[in-house]
Design a protein with these regions (language model features):
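PAPS-dependent sulfotransferase catalytic core
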Residues: 1-54, 190
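A structural signal for short, well-ordered beta-strand segments and their strand-loop junctions
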Residues: 5-7, 27-30, 56-59, 87-91, ...
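Residues within well-ordered alpha-helical secondary structure of globular protein domains
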Residues: 22, 166-170, 186
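Residue-level marker of structural boundaries
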Residues: 25, 104-108, 189
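Residue-level detector of flexible, active-site-proximal loop/helix-junction positions
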Residues: 33-35, 62-64, 155-157, 184-190
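Conserved nucleotide-sensing/catalytic segment adjacent to the nucleotide-binding pocket
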Residues: 41-77
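PAPS-dependent sulfotransferase catalytic domain
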Residues: 62-174
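C-terminal accessory extensions appended to soluble enzyme cores
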Residues: 172-199
Length: 199
């Protein structure tokens, strides 16, 4: 089985990508067209198209379009999805949470996938919020265009097994709620909140 996971940033896409890879035994291809990340980490930069193993999962973000794709008439994901058996769209309805997460990590410049607390907001960055909003609008547009339902972060990471089961049912992938829950349990979320005490 080949799965394409298209997501917005800070939506739990890495956790879901690793979960499906582990549960289904799939080869991982993580953000192959994220050129900035790959150059910084000095990792393999793939040219499109590249051969995929038969059982694999590819995680990509909506803005990651390969440099080799030049068509103005064909949407890149419309073309690429033909190489996959399943396509999952992942987004988050709370754009403020995405903004705060991205804003925090852009300031501290540490690894994205770690626990953190965002307690003191930095100066508001209008261009960052616009970028997040545009990505959100794109995935909603693409969902409507392709007839692929969006899996919402708020459902998948809710801790509610009924909501998680509905996500799995939409994917039409044979995995159990309990297996997936081990990964999407909200107690494992990256962002931590300071408990307020009443005086």
């Amino acid at each position: 089985m080949k799965i394409l996971l298209i997501a917005n940033a800070r939506t739990g896409s890495t956790v879901l990508y690793k979960a499906l890879s582990d549960i289904l035994g799939l080869k991982r291809y993580g953000e192959p067209f994220n050129y900035g990340m790959r150059k910084k980490a000095n990792t393999l930069i793939r040219k499109y198209p590249f051969p995929l193993q038969h059982n694999c999962i590819v995680k990509t973000l909506t803005r990651h379009i390969p440099e080799e794709f030049k068509s103005d008439e064909i949407n890149f994901y419309d073309e690429w999805k033909r190489d996959f058996d399943k396509v999952i769209l992942l987004a988050r309805e709370n754009l403020q949470d995405i903004y705060e997460s991205q804003d925090f990590f852009r300031h501290i410049k540490q690894h994205w996938h770690q626990k953190y607390k965002y307690e003191t907001p930095y100066t508001f960055r209008r261009e960052l919020y616009k970028f997040i909003n545009d990505s959100y609008d794109y995935i909603k547009w693409y969902s409507k265009k392709s007839h692929i339902p969006i899996t919402w972060y708020e459902d998948l990471y809710s801790g509610d097994k009924e909501k998680i089961k509905k996500c799995i049912d939409n994917w039409e992938i044979d995995i159990s709620v309990d297996d997936l829950y081990n990964y999407v349990n909200p107690e494992k979320r990256y962002r931590q909140f300071t408990k307020q005490t009443l005086i």
